[in-house]
Amino acid sequence: MLSTEMPLPTTGSTLLKTPASPSPNQNLLPLTAVINKNGELEIGGCSVPALVEQFGSPLYILDETTLRQAAQQYRQSFQAHYPGSSQVIYASKAWSCLAVVAIAAQEGLGFDVVSGGELFTTVSALKQLGWDEAEIAEKIYFHGNNKSVQELQEAIAINCTIIVDNWLELETLTKLAADSGAPVKIMLRLTPGIECHTHEYIKTGHLDSKFGFDPNQLEAVFTYIAQQPSLHCLGLHAHIGSQIFERQPHKDLGEVLVQWFTKGLTYGLPLTELNIGGGLGICYTESDDPPSIEEWAQVAAISVAKACDRQNIPYPKLIAEPGRSLVGSACVTAYRVGGRKVVPNIRTYISVDGGMSDNPRPITYQSVYRVALANRMNDEITETVTVAGKHCESGDILVKDVALPAAEPGDIMVVAATGAYNHSMASNYNRLGRPAAVLVNQGQANLILQRETYTDLLRQDCLPNRLLS
């Protein structure tokens, strides 16, 4: 799209919502983002161009204040709107590293993990914080549709709750639990058959999904578990998808889950927990309009409470699993601008020093982002360009047709809302090292992920001796 074919905003400051929404997921940039006296983007009291100068690029910049406020809003919202007990657990697949786990733990969150690696990372962080074995066991929930025997054994060893996804896993756990000599805590994941409007790849609640037990399997599952003294079934779980703006699907989910929860009680199962998953969306563009954290929590909490009242059952412990809406808006990625290519009457390309290896979402989900020049936030916007990554791949486009000042080599470009599923989905494509990440707060910047070096890229390589002869 040519710059003459669309109205251009005035400056890069349009990324800053004024006033900022108190709910982090409703902003493009972190809550602490401002433009300083030099016309530079500042986050957490730190100049973004100065951070790039110190730590290099590409660079993930995570704002501690935004992450903490999102966590606090989730906890406070469920406490305010749900009459029973509640627990917010962080869906660590969004971004799993020691520092993010530590912050979430300090804010009273539990953890949803989906692999042995995420489990190891979470347990490592919690031990460094001084948590004991009982605290760790209580706060971790292990997900996944194809957990290995080794992963199940690791989960059993720390006594965390395992969310069972299918018959094979259930039967495997029965044997492993018997071998361990102690009951294993489980929950059941069901597929509720609820549709929501989001990308096909991140829908999980409709019937045609790889996750969970279908409703027509549940009574047989209840019967089986009731006969297994080694399995202690705490409750039910469902997750209907991600990046959801609608309220109705989670209202419906609460009602469906409570119906099956009530049914499970009639089989004598000691159900006490109900896990509604996550899915609240965030702003990636100005036109995105997700509910606030409190609005989402209120809808879900009231739906479950009213359904329990209708069924005349005690309120179960209500669990929610936000991921994207906790970390997504708390982070930006900074790049250095490189070359320019002008295709007359078609498109202007601006290349940066990262791309699909540090943010695969555009090529995977056709995700749309907003960008600005962090060193020239007040400069007049003059053109529409397409931001290209540096990979040997035609599809390596970070943002299409975005309005910017005339970018020059060495400018610092930031992509907004990159906290979720950027670092966690990053790769070494074209043998690029994964970027560093810094945590910023009140003018202080701390490295939380080191930049991978060439040596790191070879760390797992093996060269057989026979190839050297």
From Swiss-Prot:
Pathway recorded for this protein: Amino-acid biosynthesis; L-lysine biosynthesis via DAP pathway; L-lysine from DL-2,6-diaminopimelate: step 1/1
Binding, pyridoxal 5'-phosphate: 279, 321-324, 421
Residue(s) carrying N6-(pyridoxal phosphate)lysine: 93
Protein's UniProt keywords contain Glycosyltransferase: no
Assembly description: Homodimer.
Biological role: Specifically catalyzes the decarboxylation of meso-diaminopimelate (meso-DAP) to L-lysine.
Family classification: Belongs to the Orn/Lys/Arg decarboxylase class-II family. LysA subfamily.
Protein name: Diaminopimelate decarboxylase
Organism listed in the record: Synechocystis sp. (strain ATCC 27184 / PCC 6803 / Kazusa)
